[in-house]
């Protein structure tokens, strides 16, 4: 999670 997105 990066600032509420980017879940890799």
Curated annotation (Swiss-Prot):
Keywords: Amidation, Hormone, Secreted, Sulfation. GO terms for molecular function: hormone activity. Disulfide bonds: none annotated. The modification Phenylalanine amide is found at residue 8. InterPro entries: Gastrin/cholecystokinin_CS. Transmembrane segments: none annotated. The modification Sulfotyrosine is found at residue 2. It is found in: Secreted. The keyword Lyase does not apply. It comes from the Eukaryota. Belongs to the gastrin/cholecystokinin family. This peptide hormone induces gall bladder contraction and the release of pancreatic enzymes in the gut. Its function in the brain is not clear. Binding to CCK-A receptors stimulates amylase release from the pancreas, binding to CCK-B receptors stimulates gastric acid secretion. This is Cholecystokinin. The gene is CCK.
């Amino acid at each position: 999670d990066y600032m509420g997105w980017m879940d890799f």
